[in-house]
């Protein structure tokens, strides 16, 4: 009995840590997020690494956007080709022919309530390939809850955010976009873990509209960090700090 009490005391102290609070919030996304699709384009592999980190923390399907013309080197000659594609979009942003062709999308976007965009930054703008996807699917994406993660070398992401808002005027933004650059790319797991609770994703459970604020109320959690069922024993967390056994 003494050993059991010591074990439970140690467990309670662990649950009081800020890291555990963040993980509890993230676990609630896994349990309560509505059906989610991660849409990404990755030229150098950085965005793919970000998607892998994101997918390890939430339950979501993935859709990789690919250019129709293969083998192009967008970075050659100081991104001359990439700049050319971006300039064509700038000149006529409402003309479908201004956007580079992409492979057909076979996923049914109608099946998803949450969309998470993961895109590279080219010369302070959204990569042209991702712009094509958003332009072509702006009607299907209308009414969705959308979040975004931007990969860049060092530039700020405000230009990419502006492109996204122009291309998707009728979506609900879940929150601020997350920028991940060369200096913090290796810390992407923790960056994403801290970012997720700041997003107001569409929930499959009507009783929970915002996981972050809900966690701060008195709730009973199992040892796995999920909400306990009625009558199920677990750990009571109140105001994110006070803990008891029920």
Q: What does each model-found stretch correspond to?
A:
Residues 22-117, 126, 193, 197:
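N-terminal beta1-alpha1-beta2 submodule of the flavodoxin-like/Rossmannoid cofactor-binding fold
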Residues 17-18, 202-224:
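Residue-level detector of functionally pivotal "anchor" positions at catalytic/ligand-binding pockets or at interdomain
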Residues 80-170:
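Helix-loop-strand module that forms the ligand-binding subsite of alpha/beta enzymes
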Residues 43-46, 67-71, 121-125, 152-156, ...:
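Solvent-exposed loop/turn segments at secondary-structure junctions
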Residues 172-205:
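Glycine-rich phosphate/pyrophosphate-binding loop and the adjoining helix
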Residues 1-25:
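Bacterial Sec-dependent N-terminal signal peptides
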Residues 235-246:
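C-terminal tail/sorting-segment detector
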